[in-house]
Each structure stands twice: as C-alpha cells, then as structure tokens.
Amino acid sequence: MTLHLTRQGATLRLRQGRLLLEEEGREVAGFPARQVRSVALWGNVRLSTPALVFLLRQGVPVFFYSLEGFLHGVAGAYPDPHPAHLRAQFAAEGLPLARAFVVGKLRSALALLERHRLPEAGGVVEALARAEGASELERLRGAEGEGSRVYFQGLARLLGPYGFGGRTRRPPRDPVNAALSYGYALLLGRVLVAVRLAGLHPEVGFLHAEGRRSPALALDLMEEFRVPVVDQVVLSAFRRGLLTPSHAEVREGGVYLNEEGRRRLIQLFEERLLEGVSHPLGFRKPLGETIEVQAQRLKAALLGRGRYTPFYLWR
C-alpha cells in the first residue's frame, strides 16, 4: 500500500500499530502500519517522530513533495552504496549506458506515435538513428533533444484541445504540462528508490550532468519510463475525460493541478504501475517491478555481469 497524503495541515501519527492521519486533533483516516510500503507527503503534511522512526525501521521510503510536484527528497533506511558498486560507477564507460537510456526512451516514443499513426514518427526514427550512431555524449544529447521535441509535437495533435502545444516546464503553462510535470515527479521518486535499493549511488550518472543534490543516475534510468508510465497516463486521462482543464489552476506564474487533479493523477499513476508490460528480453512484469528490475540489471552491467538492455514499449 502506498499512502499519498495531500490534506494540508494534517499530521501522520503512529498509534497502537496503526498510522493515523489527524487534522486539528481529529482522526480523518487510519491505516494498518505494517501494510504500508511507501508514504508520500505533499506540501504541508507533517509526520510525527514516532511514525518516522517506525517507517525508517521498516525500510519504508518517505517521499517529500511540494504541492507543485517538486521532489524535495526521500527518507529511508537505505545502506550506503557498496564500495564495489561505487568504483564500478566511476570506472564505467558512460557513453554506451547513456545511449541505452536514450534509445529506450525514443523507441517508446516511436511506438506511441505509431500507435496513433502520427506523422511525427518519421522524425523520431531519424533521431533514434542519430542516437544509435552517436560517438560523443553531446551528439547523443542532441539526438535525444530533437527526438523529444518532435515527439511532443506529435502529442500536441492529440492533446491540443486541452491547451497543449508542446512541452513547457518551470513553470508548466497549461493543464497537460502541469500533469506531465507532476507525473514525472512521482516517477522520479520511484526510480530513485529503485536505484538506492540496487546499492548504486544516485548522483553518479552517465547521461545527465552530475551535480550536488542532483540524482543524475535516477534521472538517467527514468528516461526509459517517461513515455510508458507518465505520458501514457496523462494522454489517456485527458482523452477519456478523467482529467480536464478544470483540474488545474493558475498560480505563481504557472499552471498547476488543483487538489482534485492531483488526487486523480496519483490514482491513475499507481494503477499504471500495477499493469503488466512485456520487456524486450521476453519476460512480463508489472511496470512498478520493471523499474526495480532495470535498476538491478544496470548494477549487473556495471559489475561486468552482462550487457544492459533498456526497457521500451515494443508491442
């Protein structure tokens, strides 16, 4: 069970084996503590010290998000990266791994565009060929950027009626971009936990620039799952009327999901992670588990135990 707590001003407490959400001294929700697998606190939601200590001892990750969808960080009882894993990360040839992340992302983008018979698929094919043949990191990044730009042009054909004309961020400028940004924050939290559980250092990456407090490796691995998880959820939600422009609001110079919009997107995101998908290597698992599998396979590749194969939509 994943708890997403969005009730502003509420406090999560531990009492007699249950996690209780209280507001002004009044219990508004209760959960069996040992059935909780992760907790996400959104905005001004507090956590008592006994509850935090219990969650840490149980190895339950606690995500701290802003209401706008910025991931402040994750608390969890994770061991430090294994020295052998850390040495392997620093010693690895980065370009092949960076290429794998980009190729996975662009192949999923191509699959989605082809599924909807959008003409922008041709542009993604060209970007994919450039990425596969890139001999330098900057050229690879250029191919990824061009492929993403064309891909979002294709999505604009499907989502234009909802104000979407292309990807905008910091701040998002329309309801679709608001949902995408919020969904990517959710996804980053999941990938970050998977990387840590694999015993890897999340700040030592290969595609994204490294920087203090920047989870470069988690951002790298996340590229494979943007389209299959977040983009598909957002596209389906707007086209089915589960999300509408009424679920967003203008504030602080941008457009952000309102409380009901956040609640709906969180539910759809969690449901998507439970859906089974076929991996290019032939096995089938829920998407949430596939994220963890890819982190473990990345570790194996870094330790010289096999070649890394990215995940992507292929059928």
UniProtKB/Swiss-Prot annotation:
GO terms for molecular function: DNA binding; endonuclease activity; metal ion binding. It holds the Pfam family Cas_Cas1. Its cofactor is Mg(2+); Mn(2+). GO terms for biological process: defense response to virus; maintenance of CRISPR repeat elements. Its EC number is 3.1.-.-. It comes from the Bacteria. Keywords: Antiviral defense, DNA-binding, Endonuclease, Hydrolase, Magnesium, Manganese, Metal-binding, Nuclease, Plasmid. Mn(2+) binds at E144, H208, E223. CRISPR (clustered regularly interspaced short palindromic repeat), is an adaptive immune system that provides protection against mobile genetic elements (viruses, transposable elements and conjugative plasmids). CRISPR clusters contain spacers, sequences complementary to antecedent mobile elements, and target invading nucleic acids. CRISPR clusters are transcribed and processed into CRISPR RNA (crRNA). Acts as a dsDNA endonuclease. Involved in the integration of spacer DNA into the CRISPR cassette. Belongs to the CRISPR-associated endonuclease Cas1 family. HAMAP family: Cas1. Homodimer, forms a heterotetramer with a Cas2 homodimer. Probably encoded in a type III-A CRISPR locus. This is CRISPR-associated endonuclease Cas1 1. It comes from Thermus thermophilus (strain ATCC 27634 / DSM 579 / HB8). The gene is cas1-1.
